């Protein structure tokens, strides 16, 4: 191998002065020949804490094989993961979004310290994807992301079930709509094995976005975790990285503004998670691309929602995979002039070149509609502003018959208080719930509200109640909900001064979020507002709260 392939690792392995470095590398298996090969870091998020990542050690070994075959020398190392599903609904969820930053920091630290010539990151659970991409942006060596893959659906009483099924069953059981036996059966069958949550929830949304960005191999996003194709995907990624090193292609050449526009388009067409807004902005900031809420709003207004996928629709990612996958959707969008086909990807080819030889969506399939038969003529992710969110907020309207509400505010200072109110029947049709002090700083950690929204759906209130928060929502959430309200309550945003009984309006059709009081009254209340004490005085959450930026800036902690 030419020294041109060892631009980074040569400072670790070359010359007499690096004999001590080589001695230690020999102890981990390096041979004389290996010192002349590019060193490849394989960042593995393997963990036993979640089904999303339980299999990733095996995938990392397949990547390692591919790297070896192509002439590189691989080094697997670990980073963390947090299970969003298992931390949902309690104090543990405060740590989920901060884990994105730790993943990014740890991969940056290891691969920059070891001077890896290229990096492959493998992720499964929600925060893995953006965390890995943020790190690859910072390192800016030739890089590929590999998605661990989606879980297969569970089966219960003749129906497919998944993790959201059991979250919603909590509300149904509490309301007496299902028996304890049914409740237990759903719990026992919702998650049949390895892989990320199966609808177009956050993990599958971000895997789709990353394929559209050009940072994973074509077809990677929709393969099931336990399929032989996923193992092959990992092997091919290992080989492809050496090609990228030879061509000198790094994330800065791939992750352009047009690439992010492609990702946003794919997310909107698929009906993806609101978390994509937060994470794509964060990734863009790391690579130096100016991406804002206005970009999402602009693209959403001209992009139809085409895919009938959960949580708002009927189908799972495995169903989409059977009819052509995310790459099939992208091929259709390219033909319709909705994607930038000239964007470079990790194959060393453009989006258009990659899709040329990929199969079309299966004829007569019912999962992805044609533009002329769209589920909705514009995108399901809606950016709202108004006197409650001067800097912006994000709503998702897929699958909703009702996209606006005006009603009396029911104000809660935390998710926990709101959940208890729902379960004790204190929330009535027409109410607009406000959960505040759950933002990036105030939470801290911007908790996801899946327990709350699922309880509302289970109680039959999903479309009869509005909900807004400076926190976030799981990709599994559906209902008339608004998150990411900025400025957050902790920073003195107007959401902090809403009182019980104030008339509040959510109007996704008009992109409006407001409290029906005068500007003078808002200013008067803000003048009398006093900030709350930080909830954590030490440890990682205290540090995070001091560093984190607003949701409109992707809730990043990097000092950009």
Swiss-Prot record:
Cofactor: [2Fe-2S] cluster; Mg(2+)
Main EC class the enzyme belongs to: lyase
Modified residues (N6-carboxylysine): 127
Entry's Gene Ontology BP terms: isoleucine biosynthetic process; L-valine biosynthetic process
Cited InterPro entries: DHAD_IlvD/Edd (IPR050165), Dihydro-acid_dehy_C (IPR042096), DihydroxyA_deHydtase (IPR004404), DiOHA_6PGluconate_deHydtase_CS (IPR020558), ILV_EDD_C (IPR056740), ILV_EDD_N (IPR000581), IlvD/EDD_N (IPR037237)
Catalytic activity: (2R)-2,3-dihydroxy-3-methylbutanoate = 3-methyl-2-oxobutanoate + H2O; (2R,3R)-2,3-dihydroxy-3-methylpentanoate = (S)-3-methyl-2-oxopentanoate + H2O
Gene3D superfamilies registered for this protein in UniProt: IlvD/EDD C-terminal domain-like
Active site: 474
Record EC number: 4.2.1.9
Record bears the keyword Nucleotide-binding: no
Pathways involved: Amino-acid biosynthesis; L-isoleucine biosynthesis; L-isoleucine from 2-oxobutanoate: step 3/4; Amino-acid biosynthesis; L-valine biosynthesis; L-valine from pyruvate: step 3/4
Keywords: 2Fe-2S, Amino-acid biosynthesis, Branched-chain amino acid biosynthesis, Iron, Iron-sulfur, Lyase, Magnesium, Metal-binding
Cofactor binding note of this UniProt entry: Binds 1 [2Fe-2S] cluster per subunit. This cluster acts as a Lewis acid cofactor.
Subunit structure: Homodimer.
Family recorded in the similarity comment: Belongs to the IlvD/Edd family.
Job of this protein: Functions in the biosynthesis of branched-chain amino acids. Catalyzes the dehydration of (2R,3R)-2,3-dihydroxy-3-methylpentanoate (2,3-dihydroxy-3-methylvalerate) into 2-oxo-3-methylpentanoate (2-oxo-3-methylvalerate) and of (2R)-2,3-dihydroxy-3-methylbutanoate (2,3-dihydroxyisovalerate) into 2-oxo-3-methylbutanoate (2-oxoisovalerate), the penultimate precursor to L-isoleucine and L-valine, respectively.
Protein name, UniProt field: Dihydroxy-acid dehydratase
Top-level taxonomy: Bacteria, Pseudomonadati, Spirochaetota, Spirochaetia, Leptospirales
Encoding gene (name): ilvD
């Amino acid at each position: 191998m030419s020294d041109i392939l060892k631009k980074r690792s040569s400072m670790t392995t070359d010359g007499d002065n690096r004999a001590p470095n080589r001695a230690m590398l020999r102890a981990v298996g390096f041979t004389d020949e290996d010192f002349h090969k590019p060193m490849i870091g394989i960042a593995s998020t393997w963990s036993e804490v979640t089904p999303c990542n339980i299999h990733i050690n095996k995938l990392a070994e397949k990547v390692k094989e591919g790297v070896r075959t192509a002439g590189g020398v691989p080094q697997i190392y670990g980073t963390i993961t947090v299970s969003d599903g298992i931390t949902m609904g309690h104090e543990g969820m405060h740590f989920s979004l901060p884990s994105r930053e730790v993943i990014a920091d740890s991969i940056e630290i290891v691969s920059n310290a070891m001077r890896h010539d290229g990096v492959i990151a493998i992720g499964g659970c929600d925060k893995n994807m953006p965390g890995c991409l943020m790190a690859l942006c910072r390192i800016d060596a030739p890089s590929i992301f590999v998605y661990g893959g989606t879980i297969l659906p569970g089966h219960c009483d003749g129906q497919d079930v998944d993790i959201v099924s059991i979250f919603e069953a909590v509300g149904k059981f509490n309301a007496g709509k299902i028996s304890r036996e049914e409740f237990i059966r759903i719990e026992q069958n919702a998650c049949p094995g390895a892989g990320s949550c199966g609808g177009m929830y956050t993990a599958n949304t971000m895997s789709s976005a990353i394929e559209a960005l050009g940072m994973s191999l074509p077809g990677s996003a929709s393969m099931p975790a336990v399929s032989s194709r996923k193992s092959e995907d990992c092997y091919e990624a290992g080989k492809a990285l050496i090609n990228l090193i030879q061509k000198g292609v790094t994330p800065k050449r791939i992750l352009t503004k047009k690439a992010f526009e492609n990702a946003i388009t794919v997310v909107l067409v698929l009906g993806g998670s609101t978390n994509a807004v937060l994470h794509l902005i964060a990734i863009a900031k790391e690579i130096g691309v100016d991406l804002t809420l206005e970009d999402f709003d602009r693209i959403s207004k001209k992009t139809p929602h085409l895919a009938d996928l959960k949580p708002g629709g009927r189908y799972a990612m495995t169903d989409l995979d059977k009819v052509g996958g995310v790459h099939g959707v992208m091929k259709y969008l390219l033909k319709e002039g909705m994607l930038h086909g000239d964007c470079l990807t990790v194959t060393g080819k453009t989006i258009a070149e990659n899709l040329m030889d990929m199969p079309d969506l299966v004829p007569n399939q019912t999962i992805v509609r044609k533009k002329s038969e769209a589920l909705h003529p514009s995108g399901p992710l809606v950016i709202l502003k108004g006197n409650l969110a001067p800097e912006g907020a994000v709503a998702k309207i897929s699958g909703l018959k009702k996209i606006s509400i005006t009603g009396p505010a029911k104000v809660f200072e935390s998710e926990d208080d709101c959940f208890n109110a729902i379960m004790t029947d204190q929330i009535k049709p027409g109410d607009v719930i406000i959960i505040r002090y759950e933002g990036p700083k105030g939470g801290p950690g911007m908790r996801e509200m899946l327990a709350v929204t699922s309880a509302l759906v289970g109680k039959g209130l999903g479309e009869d109640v509005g909900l807004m928060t400076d926190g976030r929502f799981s990709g599994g959430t559906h209902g008339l909900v608004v998150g990411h309200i900025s400025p957050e309550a902790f920073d003195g945003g107007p959401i902090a001064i809403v009182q019980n009984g104030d008339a509040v309006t959510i109007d996704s059709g008009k992109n409006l979020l407001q409290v029906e009081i005068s500007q003078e009254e808002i200013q008067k209340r803000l003048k009398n507002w006093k900030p709350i004490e930080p909830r954590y005085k030490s440890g990682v959450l205290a540090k995070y709260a001091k560093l984190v930026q607003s949701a409109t800036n992707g809730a990043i902690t990097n000092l950009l």
